[in-house]
């Protein structure tokens, strides 16, 4: 039996609705949030599969979607030496169940997703900022977060302490040409005619 057949059999046995999705060369499934914990538990406890290691958990922001946040779990089976991707989507106002009690490594990953996107995990009451400053305003990986942020942190020599102040850009935004050097730009700059000779 192939790996995807084993997973389909496990999901059917557990009455969990899953949808196979394409993620390059990886086996991946999309699942509704309320099926997430039972599915993770079944994958971990299955003697045939043993997906016991959470190698990564991250969020992605798709602001135009109704359920804008996609939470992605990367699992590893040491028994099969195979990876599995589980995806679930939630809206901005929804929360997602914490996987900490099933996969203990989820704790820090969930804190990171909370810090970067503002996604709440039910069952993980730790709301510490682990990548941003304690007084940081907002969630920086959301697509609606301003490019420059809201405040900047500087050391004030007069006060001899860290000070928060409004963002002050020392340089103006400029237009940059991001075309690769393998593809020449469609415009001609002064002096380009000399290079052709």
From Swiss-Prot:
It catalyses: a quinone + NADH + 5 H(+)(in) = a quinol + NAD(+) + 4 H(+)(out). The keyword Transport applies. It is a peripheral membrane protein. It is an enzyme of class 7 (translocase). GO terms for molecular function: NADH dehydrogenase (ubiquinone) activity; NADH:ubiquinone reductase (non-electrogenic) activity; quinone binding. It is found in: Cell inner membrane. Keywords: Cell inner membrane, Cell membrane, Membrane, NAD, Quinone, Translocase, Transport, Ubiquinone. Its EC number is 7.1.1.-. GO terms for cellular component: plasma membrane. The keyword Membrane applies. Belongs to the complex I 30 kDa subunit family. NDH-1 shuttles electrons from NADH, via FMN and iron-sulfur (Fe-S) centers, to quinones in the respiratory chain. The immediate electron acceptor for the enzyme in this species is believed to be ubiquinone. Couples the redox reaction to proton translocation (for every two electrons transferred, four hydrogen ions are translocated across the cytoplasmic membrane), and thus conserves the redox energy in a proton gradient. NDH-1 is composed of 14 different subunits. Subunits NuoB, C, D, E, F, and G constitute the peripheral sector of the complex. This is NADH-quinone oxidoreductase subunit C. It comes from Rickettsia typhi (strain ATCC VR-144 / Wilmington).
